Amino acid sequence: EPGVYVEGSHGIRHENEMVVRKGEKNEYGQFMYFETITFVPFDLDGLDVSLMTRYDIEWLNAYHAEVFAKVSPYLNEAEKEWLKHATRAI
């Protein structure tokens, strides 16, 4: 769970809600997978990209692309511009 904690002051945590779905079933058994059901961007200003792996960055960029694709159709132009900036690739 990503978060920022200011010692002796406060903390902020970002969490997504997920559901577990049945996936493929094969000779090894029933596989499950997670489906994200909340789509809110991470605050990019709160990230120290130097601590992130290539996988972390690729995951975040893909997640932000999905956030924009799912949420933007419900927004007016000013809100879309804000979301476009908030979900920009890093």
Across the structure, where does each feature detected by a protein language model lie?
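Charged, cofactor-coupling segments
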Residues: 1-90
